[in-house]
């Protein structure tokens, strides 16, 4: 799956959720990576900076963005603006994810499981701040393959886009919420 495909899925999710403006939401930002790149020209070296940022309100809204500029603060500001454009709402059930999910991007793969209350966010690298800023307090994850921050972030968002709450699953299956809870023994009451 490429970046275009993921961005299209994020846009579709935003439309499905009816997210148009996020001005009234207070976001917390975390800088995951700041990198300096150098372009050598006949006039000398030209430096450029890129920043990978995750934003979230710890109540279900989370997004990521990439910004590039000649100066670090400008690249971070651009990344935050990009993250606001890619913000989605994720389902939270008793502080954890509603069901097991696997996300992939490139050679990075993340497997996430719901956890009992008090477990905490067990995640490594770039995955932990995403789950924390989304508002999850208990979740178990494992990153397999590439640990590159860019790929891991996109793999996590691929997983988050696959999450469905019990009402959405019941609607698709044509069953009631109570039937699903009894049949599959899932979702805390």
Curated annotation (Swiss-Prot):
One of its GO terms (molecular function) is rRNA binding. GO terms for biological process: translation. Keywords: Ribonucleoprotein, Ribosomal protein, RNA-binding, rRNA-binding. Residues 27-90 form the S5 DRBM domain. The N-terminal domain interacts with the head of the 30S subunit; the C-terminal domain interacts with the body and contacts protein S4. The interaction surface between S4 and S5 is involved in control of translational fidelity. Belongs to the universal ribosomal protein uS5 family. With S4 and S12 plays an important role in translational accuracy. This is Small ribosomal subunit protein uS5. It comes from Hydrogenobaculum sp. (strain Y04AAS1). The lineage of its organism: Bacteria, Pseudomonadati, Aquificota, Aquificia, Aquificales. The gene is rpsE.
């Amino acid at each position: 799956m490429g970046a275009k495909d993921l961005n299209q899925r994020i846009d579709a999710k935003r439309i499905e959720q009816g997210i148009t403006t996020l001005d009234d939401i207070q976001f917390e930002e975390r800088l995951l990576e700041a990198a300096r790149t150098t372009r050598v020209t006949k006039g000398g070296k030209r430096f450029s900076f890129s920043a990978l940022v995750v934003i979230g309100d710890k109540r279900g809204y989370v997004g990521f963005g990439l910004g590039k500029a000649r100066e670090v603060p400008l690249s971070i500001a651009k990344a935050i603006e990009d993250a606001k454009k890619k913000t989605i709402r994720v389902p939270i059930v008793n502080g954890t994810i509603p069901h097991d999910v696997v996300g992939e991007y490139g050679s990075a793969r993340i497997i996430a499981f719901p956890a009992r209350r008090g477990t905490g966010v067990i995640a490594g690298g770039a995955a932990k701040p995403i789950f924390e800023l989304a508002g999850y307090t208990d979740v178990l994850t494992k990153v397999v393959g590439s640990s590159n921050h860019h790929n891991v972030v996109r793999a996590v968002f691929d997983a988050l886009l696959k999450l469905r709450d019990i009402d959405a699953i019941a609607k698709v299956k044509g069953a009631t919420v109570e039937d699903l809870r009894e049949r599959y023994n899932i979702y805390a009451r």
